[in-house]
């Protein structure tokens, strides 16, 4: 009789171990991490030269984006 009780306990432990092993691991949310900010050095290095394509003034080395190109002067002929 004690063999059946021991067998039942072992089967239950085995089933619980399989359930724990098969459970998904919780993933760390990427929203909790702060994105790294660019240092002033890398911000300056990443700026685009005169004549490169741009979307706004902040992308150009001269801070002048005219007609989607980094410009040297404000007035365009």
UniProtKB/Swiss-Prot annotation:
Chief place of localization: secreted
Transmembrane segments: none
Signal peptide start-end: 1-22
Disulfide bond sites: 54-65, 60-70
GO cellular component assignments: extracellular region
Propeptide span(s): 23-37
Role of this protein: Has an antimicrobial activity.
Name used for this protein in its record: Liver-expressed antimicrobial peptide 2
